[in-house]
From Swiss-Prot:
Catalytic activity: alpha-D-glucosamine 1-phosphate = D-glucosamine 6-phosphate
Family (UniProt): Belongs to the phosphohexose mutase family.
NCBIfam families: glmM, PRK10887.1
Source lineage: Bacteria, Pseudomonadati, Thermodesulfobacteriota, Desulfuromonadia, Geobacterales
HAMAP family the record matches: GlmM_B
Cofactor: Mg(2+)
Residue list for modification Phosphoserine: S101
EC numbers for this chain: 5.4.2.10
GO biological process: carbohydrate metabolic process; peptidoglycan biosynthetic process; UDP-N-acetylglucosamine biosynthetic process
Protein's name in the database: Phosphoglucosamine mutase
Active site: S101
Any one GO molecular-function label of the UniProt entry: phosphoglucosamine mutase activity
GO cellular component entries: cytosol
Amino acid sequence: MKKLFGTDGVRGVANVYPMTTEMAMQIGRAAAYLFKNGNRRHRIVIGKDTRLSGYMLENALVAGICSMGVDVLVVGPLPTPGIANITSSMRADAGVVISASHNAFQDNGIKFFSRDGFKLPDEMELKIEELIFSKKIDSLRPIATEVGKAYRIDDAVGRYVVFLKNTFPKELDLTGMKIVLDCANGAAYKVAPAVLEELGAEVIPYGIKPNGTNINAGFGSLHPEVISEAVKEHRADLGIALDGDADRVIFVDEFGNEVDGDHIMAICATDMLKHKKLRKNTLVATVMSNMGLDIAVKKAGGKVIKTAVGDRYVVEEMLKGGYNLGGEQSGHMIFLDHNTTGDGMLSALQVLAIMRRSGKTLSELAEVMIPLPQVLVNVRVTEKKDIMTIPEVAALIRGVEDKLKDEGRILIRYSGTEPLLRIMLEGQDKYQITGWAKEIADLVEKKIGGK
């Protein structure tokens, strides 16, 4: 059982355990020790988003890693997928991301990429914890002449911009397109506008003035209403919203209607099927994806495989099965032909390329999928116990499942990063499933709720 690492690295409130400088330094030391392999000089890339606490955690990690005789390449604020990309392109031994993704600025997190740009497997995270909690790491100290150095990589943003532009078809550009772009005052505030402008688009930017405390605050992929209003106001072709570390993207079409991750997957999967580019004709999604996605992909001659929630599990399934497209309803898209992890801007470019090639608007493309009505209710809990061990709750859930039959589904799971139980229902009748979801949520709240 892991004590520090959750579904997406170590996460918590900045300057409160485990997100302290002391723990960050220990994590850096343990990771550096594990990534060393042989007698050569080793290098680890460190990047971050725009949170104020990024400075303190970055310096603690640099100190910890250097103290183990490993050099550090500091890239500064850069999208999470950009850090993965730079890690593999610079042939570093690992990459570290300091970010809490879409969470508020008070939180921060630390996660790792292996040398090939993929997230670490659970076993490696357990080894890092074991070294820290057994105190073994305390006695491992290279002599003074063997400690590491830290270097700043000044052109990391430029390198990533070039990489992204190279994923867009050479024969196409974005001339004449008006795009509203929301960078959530996060890590993509320089990269994303540059990519779209260099490809010829007229960009109307929002959320590009980070101050350390405004990341995700009223902007970004969790607030599509910002780009929705802006698209209508500016009569733009579409809106693109990234989250704080730019590993996910949400769109709105030319009418200001939201186009979520399921629709993006449907658009990309059906286009790739048409051009015979979808490996094994299979899309990998999670159990949170709408049944409408399965129907759309099946109709186009493909199939959908479902995994647990979390882009790391999507990637694991993709690598295991040899698939090249996967994603989540929340907007994480993984195009393994191009990158190793969820990449908001890369996904946006793939959708823009389909729009350009087909001559269709985003609303026309989004018609490929008709979602079943879906309701999601979150309940704050005091403990994460197996919900089916509470007899009244289990009986209510089974009763609802019987009523839904094959016309819908119910999915109940705990958040990997917060004390929340997520209750999701899908069915033909929105009012009916809303009532059932509320009924289950109220009962859970009564039993294990925490205000």
